[in-house]
Amino acid sequence: MADVLDIDNAEEFEVDEDGDQGIVRLKEKAKHRKGRGFGSDSNTREAIHSYERVRNEDDDELEPGPQRSVEGWILFVTSIHEEAQEDEIQEKFCDYGEIKNIHLNLDRRTGFSKGYALVEYETHKQALAAKEALNGAEIMGQTIQVDWCFVKGPKRVKKSEKRRR
């Protein structure tokens, strides 16, 4: 035979007298969180921007310019002679501070340099000195260009702010 539900003994079932009020109380206590890390505090966003860029000495406003990488301050050196080796680059750049890392890409087919290198310094001061002194210098008879590898561009103006002007 089929199973039958006995409805006559309604005393066995408890009735929730609060009803939906318990659910409403739970929802009120729950916090609404957005995004990664659940941070909605604007102070964290400002702290990140102050870490990534260099402060202008004239004022407290952050200006666009070099951006620090995770490891240090990296310079992008271009127009390197194809037969240049890491030793020649290190010899040229070591006068301005301790070099943490030099990366010189080589073409796999020819074994020659691809024409650029990444030179990493620990401090901004060392990297800036090397950039200013060696931009336009010569390595193996070829003029090189030195610039920052990571640069934070100028502040973007939102479309809504452009309309107000």
From Swiss-Prot:
Keyword Cytoplasm: yes
UniProt remark on domains: The RNA recognition motif (RRM) is involved in the interaction with mago. The RNA-binding activity of such domains is therefore uncertain.
Subunit structure, as described in the record: Heterodimer (via RRM domain) with mago. Part of the mRNA splicing-dependent exon junction complex (EJC) complex; the core complex contains btz/CASC3, eIF4AIII, mago and tsu/RBM8A. Interacts with Pym (via N-terminus); the interaction is direct. Interacts with eIF4AIII.
GO-annotated cellular components: catalytic step 2 spliceosome; cytoplasm; exon-exon junction complex; NLS-dependent protein nuclear import complex; nucleus
UniProt KW Cell division keyword: no
Keyword entries, A-Z: Cytoplasm, Developmental protein, mRNA processing, mRNA splicing, mRNA transport, Nucleus, RNA-binding, Transport
Name the record gives this protein: RNA-binding protein 8A
Region ranges (Disordered): 26-47
The family this protein is said to belong to: Belongs to the RBM8A family.
Function: Core component of the splicing-dependent multiprotein exon junction complex (EJC) deposited at splice junctions on mRNAs. Involved in exon definition of genes containing long introns, including the rolled/MAPK gene. The mago-tsu heterodimer interacts with the EJC key regulator Pym leading to EJC disassembly in the cytoplasm. Has a role in oskar mRNA localization to the posterior pole of the developing oocyte.
Taxonomic lineage: Eukaryota, Metazoa, Ecdysozoa, Arthropoda, Hexapoda
Domain of life according to the entry: Eukaryota
Miscellaneous comment as given in the Swiss-Prot or TrEMBL entry: 'Tsunagi' means 'connection' or 'link' in Japanese.
Compartment(s): Nucleus; Cytoplasm
Gene Ontology terms, MF aspect: mRNA binding
GO biological process per UniProt: establishment of pole plasm mRNA localization; germarium-derived oocyte fate determination; import into nucleus; microtubule cytoskeleton organization; mRNA splicing, via spliceosome; mRNA transport; oocyte anterior/posterior axis specification; oocyte dorsal/ventral axis specification
CDD domains per UniProt: RRM_RBM8
PANTHER family: RNA-BINDING PROTEIN 8A (PTHR45894)
Residues annotated as domain RRM: 73-151
Knockout mutant characteristics: Developing photoreceptor cell clusters express reduced levels of rolled/MAPK and fail to differentiate normally.
